[in-house]
């Protein structure tokens, strides 16, 4: 789902093609490329198709020496000089739900992309139902979607490395902002997006590192919810080390979740004194990590 002429995802995997031992790299373009039909024409598409700027796919099976970090669009033209690499038009518009794109998906072992955020509720279920490994850029609030939430709760999807505020390059015509915006010495404009994260089902060592907990439970510090048998913990750093009942934590806890330490029970919108809190993950300490009775603080030696 990335235009090979403009996508940094494509450039990254071209640079590391040999290092990663890749057999094939496939990229499809939904929106017509602003580069492919101008600076570096798509070969053999015909004038009619060129005028329509139809979507295309590129299949790379051989990559020579690439000098990082720069891979300009001209590298695509160089890649296509190798007869083993091919760029061709798609029959449809490149929608990931189309039959031809689903057939391309079946060829893949791993999907890495920045999907349309508005379609995340369709994209993530598709990848999981098709049994594909994936590393995709998203927003932490996507876990609150009804279609996405079950995969977090059942442990079939989690967060990868890095989350929070990400800086993204934006076009030159992007309007300057008072906050979360900058322009570097080269004139490149940047926009910072909060709550950005990587969704994945690829296991990583970070996922199995338990949180170091130092806070101590007290009823005054951790009030109970009106509608759930759980206590409120407003920050993941303040999870009480001596509590073995159900704890409500913000969704910002998720990057630090260790499945061997806690189980995720639900995603809810609880109330305290009649006032709704934002979405909370209800978590509980794994039995092997504690022995106190449900809802009671453990004894601290």
Task: List the predicted regions and their residue ranges.
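Class I S-adenosyl-L-methionine-dependent methyltransferase catalytic core
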Residues: 1-112, 116-301
